[in-house]
């Protein structure tokens, strides 16, 4: 999996495009910490005092809703994993196959619901908003389950399955049609022996802007593409201001998102990882809570005894 290039930003330009900033003594302690704590009571103290919480979410959160990840053992659509299909080169070479893949993913999501992890995050955001506190979700997921759960402060850094972008005029539009075009009806079956449809390009999703008619593509960030600089600027601002960070259901291997939480930890801010297993970044964080996010997050984000509940 090739790291994604990153647009320069105040935090990220030094991390990914040049020399790393020298760490303060406090951040050096955090970055070399060998055994993060799993003490929920200690985390809850940090949570009670936090005024600006950033939650970085990945595929592990949605996997608990039954969303396919297309990664790791068994993570295939037909004979391919996501990194073989989610690329500009794959779309240029075979747009029919790529659209079949995304049509399948769109149709799967119509029957998926937010799980207790998504709901705990959304309920926490709403509750703390009434107390003058801020919760922001930065998600790598493209399934819109955070939206469906009720999250309002949401940065979908990799885009969404339910938006398209015209390859001719660049227009971005929401699209919840099922199927997205008639030619994809009944297509996209994931089994390895499925015959490829080879849909003619002129029958694939087309732009509906007046006078255009260009080929549409999913409005998602593919491997090898830059993230939207405007979204990265918002991410930069939220990470710089947060006083508590949660990393939930992410493997911490896809860049630039893999460096968001370590950058926060480097300035001494508490970071808590919620994941089924450890990751390459685990030892940089103050807390690590193993297990399903749908189990650990409701406890972690429940109302604290010090909260003003109206």
From Swiss-Prot:
GO MF terms listed in the record are:
histone deacetylase activity, NAD-dependent; NAD+ binding; protein-glutaryllysine deglutarylase activity; protein-malonyllysine demalonylase activity; protein-succinyllysine desuccinylase activity; zinc ion binding
Oligomeric form and interacting partners: Monomer. Homodimer. Interacts with CPS1. Interacts with PCCA.
Which gene codes for it?
Sirt5
- Which residues are recorded as binding Zn(2+)? 166, 169, 207, 212
Q: Which residues bind substrate?
A: 102, 105
Name one cellular component (GO) term. Answer: mitochondrial matrix
Keyword entries, A-Z:
Cytoplasm, Metal-binding, Mitochondrion, NAD, Nucleus, Transferase, Transit peptide, Zinc
Q: Which family does it belong to?
A: Belongs to the sirtuin family. Class III subfamily.
Which reaction(s) does the protein catalyse, per the Swiss-Prot or TrEMBL entry?
N(6)-malonyl-L-lysyl-[protein] + NAD(+) + H2O = 2''-O-malonyl-ADP-D-ribose + nicotinamide + L-lysyl-[protein]; N(6)-succinyl-L-lysyl-[protein] + NAD(+) + H2O = 2''-O-succinyl-ADP-D-ribose + nicotinamide + L-lysyl-[protein]; N(6)-glutaryl-L-lysyl-[protein] + NAD(+) + H2O = 2''-O-glutaryl-ADP-D-ribose + nicotinamide + L-lysyl-[protein]
Name by which UniProt lists this protein: NAD-dependent protein deacylase sirtuin-5, mitochondrial
């Amino acid at each position: 999996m090739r790291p994604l290039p990153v647009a320069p930003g105040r935090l990220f330009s030094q991390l990914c495009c040049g020399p790393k900033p020298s760490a303060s003594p406090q951040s050096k302690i955090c970055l070399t910490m060998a055994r993060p704590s799993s003490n929920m009571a200690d985390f809850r103290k940090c949570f009670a005092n936090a005024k600006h919480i950033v939650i970085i979410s990945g595929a592990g959160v949605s996997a608990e809703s039954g969303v396919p990840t297309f990664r790791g053992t068994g993570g295939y659509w037909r004979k391919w994993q996501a990194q073989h299909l989610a690329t500009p080169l794959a779309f240029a070479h075979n747009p029919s196959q790529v659209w079949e893949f995304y049509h399948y993913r769109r149709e799967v999501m119509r029957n998926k619901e937010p799980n207790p992890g998504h709901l705990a995050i959304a309920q926490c955001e709403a509750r703390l908003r009434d107390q003058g506190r801020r919760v922001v979700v930065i998600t790598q997921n493209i399934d819109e389950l955070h939206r469906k759960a009720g999250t309002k402060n949401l940065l979908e850094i990799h885009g969404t399955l339910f938006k398209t972008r015209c390859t001719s005029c660049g227009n971005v539009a929401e699209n919840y049609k099922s199927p997205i075009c008639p030619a994809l009806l009944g297509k996209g079956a994931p089994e390895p022996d499925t015959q490829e449809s080879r849909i003619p390009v002129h029958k694939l999703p087309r732009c509906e802007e007046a006078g255009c008619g260009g080929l549409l593509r999913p409005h998602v960030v593919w491997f090898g593409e830059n993230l939207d600089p405007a979204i990265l600027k918002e991410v930069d601002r939220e990470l710089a201001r947060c006083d508590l960070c949660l990393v939930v259901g992410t493997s911490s291997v896809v860049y630039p998102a893999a460096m968001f939480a370590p950058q926060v930890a480097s300035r001494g801010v508490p970071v808590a990882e919620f994941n089924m297993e450890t990751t390459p970044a685990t030892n940089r964080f103050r807390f690590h809570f193993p297990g399903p996010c749908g189990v650990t997050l409701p406890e972690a984000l429940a109302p604290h005894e010090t909260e003003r509940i109206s």
